[in-house]
Amino acid sequence: MRLRMRKGSPRSSHVAAVRTARCKRKHSEEDEEEESPLIEEDKLPKQETGLLSTIKNFIKGSTNKEDRENPAKRSKVERDLDNNLITSTPRTGDKPSKPIARVRRKSQVNGEATAYEVSQHMKQNGKLEDLPCTTSPPRTTLLGTIFSPVFNFFSPANKNGTSGSDSPGQAVEAEEIVKQLDMEKVDEFSTSTATNGASYPSLGAPVRSTAGSWLEGTEDTPERDIPPLTAPVSPESGYSSAHAEAAYEEDWEVFDPYFFIKHVPPLTEEQLNRKPALPLKTRSTPEFSLVLDLDETLVHCSLNELEDAALTFPVLFQDVIYQVYVRLRPFFREFLERMSQIYEIILFTASKKVYADKLLNILDPKKRLVRHRLFREHCVCVQGNYIKDLNILGRDLSKTIIIDNSPQAFAYQLSNGIPIESWFMDKNDKELLKLVPFLENLVELNEDVRPHVRDRFRLHDCLPPD
């Protein structure tokens, strides 16, 4: 019996052919994907549509879309490097580092402390590692910052300033002043009343003056206290014709306050017209005013740890915390309590307010002894030196006295000034007590104080001859 093969309908054969073609096309696409699995990063895959693609996306998730909307987090190093574009603090190297302010309290000049900033970053183990800072300029010294600055001659190194300004635009006028000094015809002399003794080189200034400050350098200084730079000198030991005829050695190591006073330029019109910094007197205010310096006149402060310090306090200056140790001059409080009853006590210092004001808040928190406080911003800057022009007080100068260990500080009112020996640590010092009888007598006389001060201390006799 012969079996006959049944032929399929044309429609069924057409459907089978279509299925076969689809399978071939599918396999060929898979082969192409295996042969070239990598695609260009900028080409996006074709997005499928329809119910089937929706189910696939729901199960697998749209990774490409998530990658575009939520890119991978950057590392901390990458973020810090980008932040260098907006930060105001320059960083060293490519590796981010956290600067840490450190205070070093070892010193080399006259036993006084120094402070400087060390750029460091934290290791992974938590220890500090020094990094040399090549982009940041070195921090300026404390010389002329927190404490009273050092006074300078009108030396060639300081030609760029003029009265009231230390800008480089006035160099010509400063040169003329230097020429007028005629240094070759002046004898080298030891400083009197305020600067007698050996010279002490300072950091960044040609001389060490009596202008109060000691620890203002940022270099290491030897661990010993400053010996007094002042000694009482009789007015008769002033200048003579023999001194003027002798040769002066231009070593710039000895600072004479009276030579400075002799050649100080006059006040400018702007400085003469400054508004008074103090309020008007009240009925309870004493008639006479007594202006007192701070550093080396009433106290001695240091960044070195002082075993005999009467008090200590921190000072924040230029983002660095400094620990200040304070010695009080003998009879400091007794002098203030006695003088505050008959004088309007005014503190006038060339130190920074951030330091001096905090110290006075500790010593006299209720302002019972010192009625007013003036700081460096109230001084007149002359050739880079700060001078205390008493006109800024707004007080009658015939009834105003200033006591300062630096006579050059009251260069513009020499007849109002009483020099006092600089004090550092002498526990037997009685200079404040010695002034009490004279000051009380001035109030009792109720006269112009200037002739009495001039006759008593004769500072004009210490000025060099013309």
Curated annotation (Swiss-Prot):
Residues 30-39 have a biased composition (Acidic residues). Residues 283-442 form the FCP1 homology domain. Keywords: Hydrolase, Protein phosphatase. The keyword DNA-binding does not apply. This is CTD small phosphatase-like protein 2-A. It comes from the Eukaryota. Residues 63-82 have a biased composition (Basic and acidic residues). One of its GO terms (molecular function) is phosphoprotein phosphatase activity. The gene is ctdspl2-a. InterPro entries: Dullard_phosphatase, FCP1_dom, HAD-like_sf, HAD_sf, TIM50. Residues 50-62, 189-199 have a biased composition (Polar residues). Residues 1-111, 189-238 are annotated as: Disordered. Belongs to the CTDSPL2 family.
